[in-house]
Amino acid sequence: MKISFHGQSCIKIITGNTTILVDPFISGNEKCDLKAEEQMPDFIVLSHGHDDHVGDTVEIAKNSGATVICNADLASFLAVEDGLENIAAMHIGGKRQFEFGQVKLTQAFHGSQTVRNGRIINLGFPTGVVFTIENKNIYFAGDTGLFSDMKLIGELNPLDVAFLPIGDNFTMGPEDAAIAARFLQTKLVIPMHYNTFPLIEQDPHKFVASLDEGISGKVLEIGESIEI
C-alpha cells in the first residue's frame, strides 16, 4: 500500500487497483501538487464539511464516479445540494467494509459547516477515520484538538500510522499533537494541516523531533509517499 501527502490534509491511498482520496482540497490550495480534473479515485473520504477539506469532491466524484464516504449529515447535503449519487453515509463509532478494507469513523473536536448562498449550513459532527487496509491500521485524525479518548482509539486499533494536524489555531498545535501521538501509541506519526495559510505555519521537523522515544515521525513533502 502506498500513501502520499498532497498538502493541508489531502492524502491519497493506493492499495492494489483501488485509489482512495482523502479531504481533496486541491483548487485554491497553492500547497497541493494535484490537479482536480486529473483525479480518478475509486473512493473519496471526507473528515468534515469545511471547504478546505471537501474541496473538489463534487467535481472529482462526478468525473470519476467515485463513492464518497462521510458522515450522514454531510452525505445528505452533498446528495441534495450537489446531486451526488454514490455516497456511503456513516456516523461516529460505526465501521463498514468496502472492497479495499474497513473504515471506522471516530470523534474529532472541531466544527463542520459551509456557507451556501449566504446561509451558514451545519454539516454534522467532524470525524477522524481509522482505515484498516492490508492488515494495517491508519488513523487520519482530521481537524481536531487533543482529547484523552485518543488513548482508546489506539487501544482498540493498534496503529501503524497516524496523520495528525499540527497547525494550531484551528486544530491542535505541535505540543498537543506530540501528546496525541503518546496517547495513540502509534508506530509512525506524519504531520498534516500546516503551512497552507499564515495562521497555521509550523516547523514539521521540529514537531517530529519532539516526539517521545519509541515513536517515529516522518515529514512527507508535497507529493511524497511512503509504502507500508
Swiss-Prot record:
Keywords of this entry: Hydrolase
Signal sequence coordinates: none
GO MF annotation terms: hydrolase activity
InterPro entries, A to Z: Metallo-B-lactamas (IPR001279), RibonucZ/Hydroxyglut_hydro (IPR036866), UPF0173 (IPR022877), UPF0173_UPF0282_UlaG_hydrolase (IPR050114)
Transmembrane segments: none
Annotated NCBIfam families: PRK00685.1
UniProt family annotation: Belongs to the UPF0173 family.
PANTHER family: UPF0173 METAL-DEPENDENT HYDROLASE MJ1163, UPF0173 METAL-DEPENDENT HYDROLASE MJ1163-RELATED
Name used for this protein in its record: UPF0173 metal-dependent hydrolase lwe1590
Organism: Listeria welshimeri serovar 6b (strain ATCC 35897 / DSM 20650 / CCUG 15529 / CIP 8149 / NCTC 11857 / SLCC 5334 / V8)
